[in-house]
Regions:
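Beta-strand segments within the central parallel beta-sheet cores of soluble alpha/beta enzyme folds
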Residues: 8, 211, 424-427, 441, ...
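Acidic/histidine-rich catalytic neighborhood
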Residues: 502-558
């Protein structure tokens, strides 16, 4: 069979936007840095792309400039001590202290006390810069001077066309602004934290062009990464030179270290890059411009780059305070050339999927989602930290990341034959392993217990949910196993063996023996978080039981491959996990009353789907449970990753028609916008676990898994309506 024409597949899904779509800005990025742009190709009109604050604070925007290294903390209030949030919970082996918090109202945690709120909100991810177009001041404007510029209003926005060329990673925007036609080209260097912008004024319009860079303070808001109300809490300093300048950013004044966090010394973290420099600089921007461009500071936190001609070229290199700026000449053409070289190589690597021959009317949309999800996860889920749920679009949960979602963001990289993109974030676990081991030790367990919601320092966040989750724990083993299968097995086992070992030690120790086998909880909240109020008595959710059994088996095989003797306890626990409760012929969600609440994630069936087959779950009972979910579930309460999870279950059960139906089910939270993002709600307008989950499901459905019977593309119907050409997938376990 001929190789897939990958360029044709990708170019079928070039993103074209006419006018303002307030939910669907475009992005450029490289995994470490990303820029979201409006219809002007920059961030001229952030108010047209709003994101409300769940607590009722100032509205944020989808137009963020975010990185993996840009973090900030406001000064710590008295009493903000994580140990003070620990509460005793009864367990089968006695009292154990857990980080805890009062119940929350959805994402609104504003009612918490100041100390607890600080621990939840710091460090938070920064919006590094707001980069937007200015327009020339008319000569007849009151007080106007030749060469002056002003911010345009949305009323001055005319016709516009915008294209995201996925093959080159470049956004081209043609827009009429204040009566002048402009062409704006935007790109990000694939290997450096460097943005490039070229603005060209149409020959028929008066000359003169300018770009403004504005800098906010860090924000403790749940979704708004920029605080524009505290200009006195930070400093912006411009130093000019021929052909550009440098902007130094100091947060919380110049007297002490700026609050860009993430390195050794931040509550015990080690090895995570991103510390403030010794000079108190939080981060810096190196500006490269045309020789005739003017660069000036026009306000306390504003810098303007302008030219009296028709072309403005601007390169913005960003770096944390302790890091050097980009060495050597970097030009707009250089960045565009680097992007045009990188992205065809990206698309040519790993796996590809071509559904063009299918007659099912949904095939084109599935292929579109798969192509755009590859781009979106590459530019914001392939960095040095586990991603936040909104990637690098803007903040959710203040930019902090959730380890139970790491698998959903990034497992697909290995399954699609790009394991190096997953490996970038795996090193973070090494950095915070001492803290994870300390948590386990404090609770009386062996090994390392991985937290739920964290910043780069790995410190837990007080919550009535997060500290009681367990299903993030096996993810480390699962991700490492996917890397082993996709790459050099011996190297991967040597590299990640200690992480797998410490993860498994906790898993084997936290499981408690009972009359029917080894069980989990209490306290415990399953992946289906509907049982938060019952955490002090929840036991034995089916997904977690199956995941425990499978992951401990994988860890044991790793020990043997490493030359170590098997760990008897791991076999005893893994093979002896209690079977989950069955009621009325289906699996109950938990082992105690009320047994099953029919909201949130229907995770009772994910232990055969996300997780390979084990002896813990009976496929016939999983099938019956899936049927009951289909018949009666509160679908609006599900999340974007539930649909690929359900599709994986249907696939492993041998029901490909249902798998496709579930993957593309028409539900509000399974919407993929024109830009490819999986929208959930107004304040969660991008949701990368949905994109990564879709790619993981497609990999299973197309590439198959061990012991799948050998049928090609086993997750797609074999009725002639789906013609699934694929290459390069790594079979799932």
């Amino acid at each position: 069979m001929a190789a897939i024409d990958r360029q044709a597949v990708v170019r079928r899904h070039t993103v074209r936007v006419a006018g303002v779509d307030p939910r669907s800005p475009l992005q450029v990025g490289n995994g470490e840095l990303a820029l979201s742009v409006d219809v002007t190709g920059l961030q001229t009109f952030p108010e047209l792309y709003p994101v409300p604050d769940p607590a009722g604070g100032p509205t944020g925007t989808l137009l963020g400039t975010q990185s993996q290294w840009g973090w900030h903390s406001v000064p710590r209030p008295a009493g903000a001590d994580l140990d003070a949030t620990r509460r005793p919970y009864r367990t089968p082996r006695g009292e154990v202290r857990y980080v805890d918090a009062a119940p929350l109202s959805g994402s609104d945690d504003s009612a918490l006390d100041e100390a607890t709120l600080w621990l939840r909100a710091n460090p938070h991810r920064l919006d590094l810069a707001r980069i937007g177009l200015l327009v020339p001041v008319d000569a007849d404007d009151a007080g106007g001077r030749a060469g002056d510029h002003r911010a345009p209003s949305p009323d001055e926005l005319g016709a516009s066309e915008q294209v995201l060329d996925l093959w080159t990673g470049t956004v081209t925007s043609q827009v009429v602004l204040a009566g002048r036609r402009l062409r704006v080209t935007t790109a990000c260097h694939p290997a450096r934290d460097v943005l490039a912008v070229r603005v060209v004024v149409d020959d028929a319009a008066p000359p003169g062009v300018a770009v403004r860079l504005a800098f906010p303070y860090g924000s403790e808001s749940w979704s708004n990464a920029a605080d524009w109300t505290r200009p006195g809490a930070h400093l912006t300093e411009l130093t000019t030179r021929p052909g550009g300048g440098q902007v130094l950013r100091r947060l919380d004044g110049a007297a002490g270290p700026a609050g860009v966090e993430g390195a050794a010394g931040v509550e015990g973290a080690a090895g995570v890059e991103g510390a403030a420099g010794a000079d108190g600089v939080g981060y810096r921007l190196d500006l490269r411009t045309g020789a005739r461009h003017a660069v000036e500071q026009t306000g306390p936190h504003e810098v303007v780059v302008s030219d009296s001609g028709r072309v403005l070229e601007l390169v913005v290199a960003l770096a944390p305070g302790g890091a050097p700026v980009v060495d050597g000449p970097v030009t707009v053409d250089g960045v565009l050339d680097a992007a045009a070289d990188h992205w065809p190589r990206f698309w040519g690597s790993g796996a590809a999927l071509d559904l063009a021959g299918s007659t099912d009317p949904r095939a084109h949309e599935l292929e579109r989602r798969a192509v755009l999800s590859q781009y979106l996860t590459a530019i914001q889920c392939a960095g040095s930290l586990p991603p936040q749920e909104t990637g690098l679009v803007g903040n959710s949960w203040r930019g902090r990341f959730h380890l139970e979602m790491h698998w959903w963001h990034a497992a697909h990289f290995a399954l699609w034959g790009r394991p190096e993109l997953l490996e970038r974030s795996m090193a973070w676990y090494d950095a915070v392993l001492p803290r994870a081991r300390a948590t386990a030790r404090l609770q009386g367990y062996a090994g390392a217990r991985w937290p739920k919601q964290v910043g780069p320092d790995g410190r837990e966040s007080p919550s009535d949910i997060g500290p009681f989750l367990l299903w993030q724990q096996p993810h480390v083993i699962h991700l490492a196993e996917l890397l082993r299968r996709a790459g050099d097995s011996a190297r991967v086992v040597q590299r990640y063996g200690d992480l797998v070992e410490q993860t498994a030690r906790f898993m084997a120790d936290v499981a408690e023996p009972g009359p029917d086998g080894y069980g989990l909880g209490p306290p415990l909240i399953p992946a289906q978080e509907s049982y938060a109020a019952l955490r002090d008595r929840v036991t034995n959710p089916p997904f977690e039981l199956a995941y425990w059994a499978w992951a401990l088996g994988v860890a044991q095989r790793w020990r043997v491959q490493s030359g170590h003797p098997p760990e008897p306890r791991w076999d005893e626990v893994g093979r002896g996990m209690v079977r989950p409760l069955v009621r009325d012929g289906v699996y109950a969600a938990i082992g105690v009353e009320p047994f099953t609440i029919r909201t949130d994630h229907p995770s009772m069936v994910y232990g055969l789907g996300v997780v390979p087959a084990t002896d813990v779950l009976d496929p016939a009972l999983v099938r019956a449970t899936l049927s009951s979910v289909m018949a009666d579930w509160d679908w609006p309460s599900t999340w974007g990753w539930d649909y690929p999870a359900l599709a994986m279950t249907a696939t492993r059960l041998g029901d490909p028609a249902l798998a496709v139906d579930l993957l593309l089910r028409d539900e509000a939270k399974n919407l993929h916008l024109p830009n490819g993002h999986n929208r959930q709600t107004d304040h969660l307008a991008a949701y990368l676990p949905g994109n990564g989950g879709l790619l993981a499901a497609v990999a299973l459905m197309a590439g198959g898994w061990d012991d799948d019977g050998g049928r090609p593309a086993p997750g797609f119907p074999d009725d002639g309506t789906w013609v699934v050409r694929h290459e390069g997938f790594v079979p799932a376990p």
